[in-house]
């Protein structure tokens, strides 16, 4: 049994959600996907260093509950964790923003996506960091995950 069959079984059992790459060609959309468990408890069984993966998985679950199949990821020369084109929303998941290179990586990706597709709202979801920054005319909210989930995205 190949891995794709396992993925399909997990999807049919409502244990896994899959996001398409918004930037990929039509033929790639079926093969190049990012997969997330619908429950962080399931993911926790399979990983050793859970912090970042659990945060990203929680963001995927939260966005999928609100926007359904309108949630994508973006990966073409830049990587943005979540993109909701109908809402003009881009979300990055980053456990800590204390490292300058991590901050720069997340911000550059949002600015680059905004230059391709004008965004109405950009958010970096973190474990505990909070603030607002502006880069190249783009307002970027940095929000702790608990506040982001409670406010309904």
Label every model-predicted segment:
Residues 128-153:
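Domain-level recognition of nuclease-like catalytic cores that cleave nucleotide substrates
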Residues 1-90:
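Accessory nucleic acid-recognition modules appended to NTPase machines
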Residues 53-54, 101-104:
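Conserved phosphate-coordination/catalytic loops
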Residues 103-116:
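Short, charged, amphipathic alpha-helix that recurs within catalytic cores of restriction-modification
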Residues 85-99, 106:
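Active-site ExK catalytic segment of metal-dependent nucleases
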Residues 36, 91, 123-125, 141-143:
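Hydrophobic/aromatic beta-strand patches that form the interior of the parallel beta-sheet core
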Residues 80-81, 99-102, 131-135:
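Short active-site-adjacent structural elements
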Residues 72-74, 120-126:
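Short, hydrophobic beta-strand segments that form beta-sheet elements in well-ordered domains
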């Amino acid at each position: 049994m190949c891995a794709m069959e396992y993925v399909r079984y997990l999807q049919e059992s409502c244990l896994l959600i899959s996001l398409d790459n918004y930037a990929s060609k039509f033929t790639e959309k079926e093969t190049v996907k990012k997969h997330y468990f619908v429950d962080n408890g399931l993911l926790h069984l399979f990983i050793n260093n859970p912090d970042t993966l659990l945060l990203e998985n929680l963001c995927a679950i939260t966005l999928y509950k609100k926007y359904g199949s309108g949630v994508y990821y973006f990966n073409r020369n830049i990587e943005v964790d979540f993109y909701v084109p109908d809402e003009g929303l881009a979300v990055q998941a980053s456990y800590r923003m204390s490292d300058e290179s991590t901050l720069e990586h997340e911000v550059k990706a949002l600015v680059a996506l905004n230059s391709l597709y004008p965004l109405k709202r950009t958010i970096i979801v973190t474990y505990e960091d909070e603030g607002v920054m502006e880069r190249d005319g783009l307002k970027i909210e940095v929000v702790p995950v608990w506040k982001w989930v409670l406010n309904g995205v």
